[in-house]
Amino acid sequence: MEGMRRPTPTVYVGRVPIGGAHPIAVQSMTNTPTRDVEATTAQVLELHRAGSEIVRLTVNDEEAAKAVPEIKRRLLAEGVEVPLVGDFHFNGHLLLRKYPKMAEALDKFRINPGTLGRGRHKDEHFAEMIRIAMDLGKPVRIGANWGSLDPALLTELMDRNASRPEPKSAHEVVLEALVESAVRAYEAALEMGLGEDKLVLSAKVSKARDLVWVYRELARRTQAPLHLGLTEAGMGVKGIVASAAALAPLLLEGIGDTIRVSLTPSPKEPRTKEVEVAQEILQALGLRAFAPEVTSCPGCGRTTSTFFQELAEEVSRRLKERLPEWRARYPGVEELKVAVMGCVVNGPGESKHAHIGISLPGAGEEPKAPVYADGKLLTILKGEGIAEEFLRLVEDYVKTRFAPKA
């Protein structure tokens, strides 16, 4: 399902490959205090079971550092080998040096070049973290963020901009500084001897247009696999739409090797929502398939009944319910496309484009529902049992279409 991808080295984070021709990986991050081993382990398991292929956790103090090996041990005891990424700011060099078991337990280090200190201390702290990564054979994500830019670098670029015949806006210079911060750290790590197969790069902002510009620049200036994400995307529909709007143009250009959707969860929503949204973005773009899809129309004046809406909802629920068993028994079932349409205008055509689809009668239409499979009329359903009959047909189709080859 992959389109043309920007060529990069492959970086292994644990057993998960990032970059090259490998599928775009979905990441997430815990929001529990890492020092709370029980809560953090439970959330990592929850995120992983929802589909997160890599999970990041903050390592912000000594108690968090001490907790990491035990979190890893408990995950392995559950048979879960999801890679863990340590997120370091301000004191990462100290923690990695003092707690070697923590460093060994992590599968990748995230280093923010804007939170390493100032002046020569910044370079020393960065070099120490890179040396530890090299000694342990760990990959590193150099992750810059416009909310924590190095003020010295920003001042340097602002001064340079002021001497231009036609200075750029302050906002443009901030974006340039963000890219420069990431690229300089990337080049410094390479000069220290960290291999290209151990480096991932990111530079995050909170506006969609800015993110597209920044990542096009990173793609132009480096060969590194890129971690995409709109930082502080926000809550609910706004956060989902902003993330999709920011990531889609880049992904369609072949830019991006792993993604995270940084939603602010509402108190009523699970942390796994960000994983679900990331998967939906990749699936909507045709880049990966995680679960069967249901295509359904929005309804109009021709669809006076809510039956097609109820059926679409029930089909979606049933597919989600059956997916764990289907995935184990029927390879490729994630590619399944089901159509539930509300009237004769687009119903038959959309149903023919799906693997299996039903075109329900609209207002004033004859009370019958043709079902199509692989583009051909399979049967016509009538009466009160249309919903259950269609669900049975979907089940039969899966068993036939996706049965393992003998």
From Swiss-Prot:
Transmembrane segments: none annotated. Its cofactor is [4Fe-4S] cluster. HAMAP family: IspG (MF_00159). Binds 1 [4Fe-4S] cluster. It is an enzyme of class 1 (oxidoreductase). Keywords: 4Fe-4S, Iron, Iron-sulfur, Isoprene biosynthesis, Metal-binding, Oxidoreductase. Pathway: Isoprenoid biosynthesis; isopentenyl diphosphate biosynthesis via DXP pathway; isopentenyl diphosphate from 1-deoxy-D-xylulose 5-phosphate: step 5/6. PANTHER family: 4-HYDROXY-3-METHYLBUT-2-EN-1-YL DIPHOSPHATE SYNTHASE, 4-HYDROXY-3-METHYLBUT-2-EN-1-YL DIPHOSPHATE SYNTHASE (FERREDOXIN), CHLOROPLASTIC. The gene is ispG. Optimum pH is 7.5. The keyword tRNA-binding does not apply. [4Fe-4S] cluster binds at residues 297, 300, 343, 350. Converts 2C-methyl-D-erythritol 2,4-cyclodiphosphate (ME-2,4cPP) into 1-hydroxy-2-methyl-2-(E)-butenyl 4-diphosphate. This is 4-hydroxy-3-methylbut-2-en-1-yl diphosphate synthase (flavodoxin). Optimum temperature is 55 degrees Celsius. GO terms for biological process: isopentenyl diphosphate biosynthetic process, methylerythritol 4-phosphate pathway; terpenoid biosynthetic process. Pfam families: GcpE. Disulfide bonds: none annotated. The keyword DNA-binding does not apply. The lineage of its organism: Bacteria, Thermotogati, Deinococcota, Deinococci, Thermales. GO terms for molecular function: 4 iron, 4 sulfur cluster binding; 4-hydroxy-3-methylbut-2-en-1-yl diphosphate synthase activity (ferredoxin); 4-hydroxy-3-methylbut-2-enyl-diphosphate synthase activity (flavodoxin); iron ion binding. Belongs to the IspG family. It catalyses: (2E)-4-hydroxy-3-methylbut-2-enyl diphosphate + oxidized [flavodoxin] + H2O + 2 H(+) = 2-C-methyl-D-erythritol 2,4-cyclic diphosphate + reduced [flavodoxin]. Its EC number is 1.17.7.3.
